[in-house]
């Protein structure tokens, strides 16, 4: 159980540098914009690969807060983040697009605008939903600890039904659907996966839908293979149980 959770958490927000190295030379994507109220803060542009986070670039912001980062295009969607301290904006890249972000520190994680990318508009929606779920759960544990566990279960199930129906199953080939698979909340100082194929056969079917779709649209990608490994492990565990 611990091994699959580590694999899942790493897989979502964590493809290796091999894919980056093999990307098309010369073709670039761009992430640019402004972060207000962040003078002298260091803005990091980080790649979120299967094996962890790596810093692609960084910049010390001036009073205007302007930034511009670029990276090599690869053949499947990849995930990055803009970060100042603990404030994070998740970004998906699936082409040589230019993604424009405007935000204001220190609320950049929740109050930002992203333009030029349908995928990233959806990722913002999902990120805000996740933050709202986390806030509700934390409030329950703070103020109603005696009933928190049961109510949190209902909230999580409702969240999963909404996201699976209105996001993942609608467009399982999209980067935002992959992103949704690996969302989590923190309960009692421990990360809890929202979709957990190691514990719930229905969740494993959701993973399987994205894995199958990525096989079709992004054959031989490391992320697609990782999804398959997780799904197969979940099926085996379910049969054993």
Describe every region a protein language model picked out.
Residues 146-151, 190-202:
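Short coil/turn connectors between adjacent alpha-helices in alpha-solenoid helical repeat scaffolds
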Residues 1-13:
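Bacterial N-terminal signal peptides that target proteins for export
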Residues 198-241:
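N-proximal helix/coil linker or "cap" segments that precede and/or mark the start of modular domains
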Residues 24-167:
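A non-transmembrane, solvent-exposed segment enriched in polar/low-complexity residues
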Residues 166-171, 217-220:
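Flexible helix-coil transition and linker loops at the boundaries of alpha-helical arrays
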Residues 131, 135, 172-193:
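Amphipathic alpha-helical repeat scaffolds of TPR domains
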Residues 19-23:
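C-terminal motif of bacterial Sec signal peptides marking the signal peptidase cleavage site
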